[in-house]
Swiss-Prot record:
This is Peptide deformylase. HAMAP family: Pep_deformylase. The active site is at 164. Its EC number is 3.5.1.88. InterPro entries: Peptide_deformylase, Peptide_deformylase_sf. The lineage of its organism: Bacteria, Bacillati, Cyanobacteriota, Cyanophyceae, Synechococcales. Gene3D superfamilies: Peptide deformylase. One of its GO terms (molecular function) is peptide deformylase activity.
Length: 201
């Protein structure tokens, strides 16, 4: 698909190799991933002013924690850090493919066409429900070296970016679920409280 992760990775320049970390589970991840009900997930993230080695090391620790949890995306608020930073890797099987690091991302355009697809979240483990989102997006962001970038994405990449960007605004995917009966059932089965959902659907 256009804007696929493999295509984006091929277009990236070699400096992104600085973000490569082993795509394996650690016995103890460096960062704790907060779960639904933790108020930290509901606080909006702040823009990052200066992109430096501290920011890059945070991104690496987020990746290590994400790989340990077997996820494909993670936003800084999920680990209790209210900065506009997210990491994505849709190619977990290929150790040489660099992950995508988005700093201060902004969606500049979204398709009129919508798509329904099942989503899950490391902050709501075990819960999987359909969410409607734009099929394709355009966005601007800074990369891990602080350089301004623009990008087009569709399919799973577009969905993953939108899902992770929601976290920067204190929104979780369950807030966008329209099937309230299914939502109630899934949350109850996995030990979460319906009252912790803040519907925006």
């Amino acid at each position: 698909m256009a804007g696929s992760f493999a295509e984006l990775a091929r277009q990236a320049d070699k400096s992104r190799d600085t973000m490569l970390v082993p795509k394996t589970a650690l016995e103890t991840p460096p960062l704790e991933i907060h779960t639904l009900g933790d108020e930290v997930l509901r606080q909006p993230a702040r823009r990052i002013g200066k992109v430096n080695e501290q920011v890059r090391e945070l991104a690496r620790d987020m990746l290590r924690s994400m790989y340990t949890a077997k996820g494909i995306g993670l936003a800084a608020p999920q680990v209790g850090i209210h900065q506009q930073l997210l990491v994505i890797d849709l190619d977990l099987e290929n150790a040489a493919t660099p992950p995508l690091v988005l700093i201060n991302p902004e969606i500049t355009a979204a398709s009129a066409g919508l798509d329904t697809y099942e989503e899950g979240c490391l902050s709501i483990p075990g819960v999987y429900l359909d969410v409607v989102r734009p099929t394709a997006i355009e966005l601007s962001f800074r990369d891990e070296m602080g350089r301004p970038r623009k990008m087009k994405a569709d399919g799973l990449m577009a969905r993953c970016i939108q899902h992770e960007m929601d976290h920067l605004n204190g929104v979780l995917f369950v807030d966008r679920v329209t099937d309230q009966d299914g939502l109630q059932k899934e949350l109850k089965e996995k030990g979460f409280e319906r009252q912790d959902v803040r519907s925006v659907a």
